[in-house]
Regions:
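Glycine- and acidic-residue-biased ligand/ion/polar-headgroup-sensing regions
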Residues: 86-105
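A short glycine-rich, His/Asp/Glu-containing loop-to-beta-strand
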Residues: 42, 46-81
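Double-stranded beta-helix
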Residues: 107-109, 136-168
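Mid/C-terminal beta-alpha module of Rossmann-like enzyme folds, strongest
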Residues: 1-46
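Short beta-strand His + acidic residue motifs that chelate non-heme Fe in jelly-roll/DSBH
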Residues: 56, 80-82, 100-102, 123-125, ...
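A short beta-loop-beta micro-motif enriched in histidine and acidic residues
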Residues: 77-90, 117-119
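Short acidic-glycine-tyrosine-enriched beta hairpin
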Residues: 104-128, 134, 142
Length: 168
């Protein structure tokens, strides 16, 4: 049964679809599977559909919802510097360029993904990995973020933690 669940998660995720995460065990299996894929399979390239109206790409497909939001970030500014214990989170740069830096908790190795809005891709943030996004361009950075759950200010599952550790 466990192997079937993991196989189903893999098949769904291979199609860039986030599986149903209503069941706590399925959520934990999905987070474990994403952790297994990281960092070799990041960022994940997406298909850019363009015509005379402009361009479109599908960044998030999910079987059970969640919350998406956009942010703008001024040149040189860093957002984040925190980690999550359970939250499934996806970053998609829509316009501009950025470095997404991720560090596994209790490790000092930082993985950096340089991404651009004109080269659509997503980066899923593994649980228990502190992360940040920095606008590395001169223009405003526009980023779409998605989480599998609605934000709850009484239980945010967001713990402050530096990505780049200071050397002593």
């Amino acid at each position: 049964e466990l192997l079937d669940s993991l196989g189903s998660i893999k098949q769904t995720y291979d199609e860039h679809i986030v599986p149903s995460l209503d069941d706590p065990l399925q959520l934990r299996l999905f987070n474990t599977y994403r952790s297994y894929l990281y960092p070799e399979n990041c960022p994940v390239p997406l298909t850019l559909h363009s015509d005379n109206r402009g361009s479109l790409f599908e960044g998030i497909k999910t079987l059970n919802g969640g919350q998406g939001f956009f942010s703008t970030t001024h040149s040189g500014i860093i957002r984040g510097r925190h980690y999550h214990r359970f939250k499934v989170e996806r970053f998609l740069v829509v316009s501009g360029q950025a470095d997404i830096r991720i560090r596994r908790m209790f490790d000092d190795k930082v993985v950096t993904f340089s991404v651009r809005g004109n080269e659509p891709c997503f980066v899923d943030i593994p649980t228990l990995h502190t992360h940040e996004i920095q606008n590395t361009g001169t223009e405003e950075l526009l980023t779409f973020f998605w989480s599998h759950e609605l934000f709850n200010p009484d239980n945010p599952d967001t713990i402050a933690s530096a990505v780049i550790l200071e050397e002593n």
